[in-house]
Amino acid sequence: MAVVPASLSGQDVGSFAYLTIKDRIPQILTKVIDTLHRHKSEFFEKHGEEGVEAEKKAISLLSKLRNELQTDKPFIPLVEKFVDTDIWNQYLEYQQSLLNESDGKSRWFYSPWLLVECYMYRRIHEAIIQSPPIDYFDVFKESKEQNFYGSQESIIALCTHLQQLIRTIEDLDENQLKDEFFKLLQISLWGNKCDLSLSGGESSSQNTNVLNSLEDLKPFILLNDMEHLWSLLSNCKKTREKASATRVYIVLDNSGFELVTDLILADFLLSSELATEVHFYGKTIPWFVSDTTIHDFNWLIEQVKHSNHKWMSKCGADWEEYIKMGKWVYHNHIFWTLPHEYCAMPQVAPDLYAELQKAHLILFKGDLNYRKLTGDRKWEFSVPFHQALNGFHPAPLCTIRTLKAEIQVGLQPGQGEQLLASEPSWWTTGKYGIFQYDGPL
């Protein structure tokens, strides 16, 4: 196997990883502590003094975590017994064995950035589960729900578009169907801009109708493998036996507006018969501020269904029906909230890898998935995507991502360098997007 480059880390002063660890992560921790403070009366109403004491305990644990981060203390093992605790602690030991630091301890600014961020969110979860009876509390729930409520006009526009499309879908010729598929893929791409971890938990609602902006946004798609996706799925549709299935898996990113765009794409896949089943993978615990959990998934569908708007409500009712019929299936797996890069999946989570191998196509949404697919390493811009996947090839896959981290592969020679020279922050603001495919052509 080819030598893989070093991991991105906070050692590179001034890098996006460094600034994330120095500024954004402490800001997110401060917001989490503030959220717990603001819910103090709710905890008292539900649980009496016990709830208030639990809130104090959680805040104390989180304040300690913030201090560890800001003073670059060594990582400490997880202590609360949870389904993934042993795997986490083994990984922390493994990472420590790789370090050349004088005391051989993993620290915030010297460890791989991917590990640092995942560890921080896992420690937030530990602080909550160590504080019963408020151990059920999702510290990011409010901001995820605000993102959804703040995007109502855009959601109504998308639901209306989808319902009108479904009503005429049988009259569309192949080129028209392809155009609509590409349109909804692009909406799912730009929906990925709504990332609350990038904004430090500040509002990132979608206030404009993305449908009207697609032409203007096209120049910002750096890699466009949508044709490969169409070719793959339309071929599956043409050659499918009557009783056989075409499975598309979507590894989700953000809840709120982005999740709506993903569900609209998933609805279109069924309505157009490009797929017969859509499987969704979310996070088992609150993660990276806005990532989708099973609670977020069910809550959002319920909200859409109970909307006062005719077409929005119809979408929600349809989506609920798909779930009842088994055409949409939501899966939980702890692997998605581990710090491992995806090339480790066959060893760490062979059951999940075997499940992914059943897919005809896997869509990986967002930046964290891209970082884990490529190992979050200092790859050259022109390294082929297939190579950067480092042996992770369960099924044909495509990453749909707006760029918010200093990692990108598969570009034309000189393309990344040119962008860097003209626009130093081109790969960290969400301005540019990619559809990057790996699989048979």
Swiss-Prot record:
Catalytic activity: beta-D-fructose 1-phosphate + H2O = D-fructose + phosphate; beta-D-fructose 6-phosphate = dihydroxyacetone + D-glyceraldehyde 3-phosphate; L-glutamyl-[protein] + S-adenosyl-L-methionine = [protein]-L-glutamate 5-O-methyl ester + S-adenosyl-L-homocysteine
Modified residues (N6-acetyllysine): 40
Keywords: Acetylation, DNA damage, Hydrolase, Manganese, Metal-binding, Methylation, Methyltransferase, Nickel, Phosphoprotein, S-adenosyl-L-methionine, Transferase
Binding site residues for substrate: 253-254, 367-371, 404
Annotated EC: 3.1.3.-, 2.1.1.-
UniProt modified residues of type Phosphoserine: 102
Its job: Metal-dependent phosphatase that shows phosphatase activity against several substrates, including fructose-1-phosphate and fructose-6-phosphate. Its preference for fructose-1-phosphate, a strong glycating agent that causes DNA damage rather than a canonical yeast metabolite, suggests a damage-control function in hexose phosphate metabolism. Has also been shown to have O-methyltransferase activity that methylates glutamate residues of target proteins to form gamma-glutamyl methyl ester residues. Possibly methylates PCNA, suggesting it is involved in the DNA damage response.
N-acetylalanine carried by residues: 2
Post-translational modification: Automethylated.
UniProt record similarity statement: Belongs to the damage-control phosphatase family. Sugar phosphate phosphatase III subfamily.
GO molecular function terms noted in the UniProt entry: enzyme binding; fructose 6-phosphate aldolase activity; fructose-1-phosphatase activity; metal ion binding; phosphatase activity; protein carboxyl O-methyltransferase activity; protein-glutamate O-methyltransferase activity; S-adenosylmethionine-dependent methyltransferase activity
UniProt remark on domains: Subfamily III proteins have a conserved RTxK motif about 40-50 residues from the C-terminus; the threonine may be replaced by serine or cysteine.
Keyword Transferase part of the UniProt annotation: yes
Cofactor: Mn(2+); Ni(2+)
UniProt GO BP: DNA damage response; methylation
Motif (Subfamily III RTxK motif): 401-404
Annotated Mn(2+) binding sites: 253-254, 291
Annotated residues for binding of S-adenosyl-L-methionine: 258, 291
Protein name (record): Damage-control phosphatase ARMT1
